[in-house]
């Protein structure tokens, strides 16, 4: 079921505004995956994990979200795009070429996106992740820890 869900991109995204409450303006948008097949997006990701398709779902979701954002005419002046990503996606050997493709498609500039690293996944090589994050930072892509401190 999850393979078909991914292959047909049977999901869409909401872009939740993130406000600077002190200054009263939108600083960016958090990308939220939604679907009619999964009432809760966590169920889709859990299914992808179970079927070893997490990278496929994560990368397809990121790509579709960026295409949607870009085709809607949003630019840097509307704010930064905050995109949730699993550590295993960042560590996947296909991820660097995925980023290159996105950059070539001009779906983002390196300052347009912040990868929010999910804490829901805990079984990964932290040293390897640090190296990947350094590489992202070298090309100007920012990152943050998603839901830091929530257990």
Regions found by a protein language model. Name each.
Residues 132-146:
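Short beta-strand/loop segments at the ligand-binding rim of alpha/beta enzyme cores
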Residues 36-39, 62, 66, 147:
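Short acidic-capped amphipathic helix/loop micro-motif used as an active-site/signal-coupling element
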Residues 1-47:
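Active-site core of bacterial EAL-family cyclic-dinucleotide phosphodiesterase domains
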Residues 12, 28-30, 78-82, 112-116, ...:
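Structural preference for beta-strand elements that scaffold enzyme active sites
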Residues 18, 86-88, 118-120, 141, ...:
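Active-site beta-loop-alpha junctions enriched in small/polar residues
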């Amino acid at each position: 079921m999850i393979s078909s869900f991914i292959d047909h991109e049977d999901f869409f995204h909401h872009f939740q505004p993130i406000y600077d409450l002190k200054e009263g303006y939108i600083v960016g948008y958090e990308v939220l995956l939604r679907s009619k097949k999964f009432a809760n997006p966590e169920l889709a990701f859990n299914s992808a994990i179970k079927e070893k398709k997490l990278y496929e779902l994560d990368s397809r979701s990121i790509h579709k979200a960026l295409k949607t954002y870009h085709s809607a005419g949003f630019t840097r002046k509307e704010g930064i795009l905050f995109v949730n990503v699993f550590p295993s996606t960042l560590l996947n050997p296909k991820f660097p070429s995925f980023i290159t493709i996105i950059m070539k498609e001009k779906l983002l500039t390196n300052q347009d996106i912040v990868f929010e690293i999910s804490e829901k996944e805990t079984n990964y090589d932290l040293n390897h992740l640090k190296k990947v994050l350094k590489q992202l930072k070298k090309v100007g892509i920012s990152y943050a820890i998603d839901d830091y401190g929530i257990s």
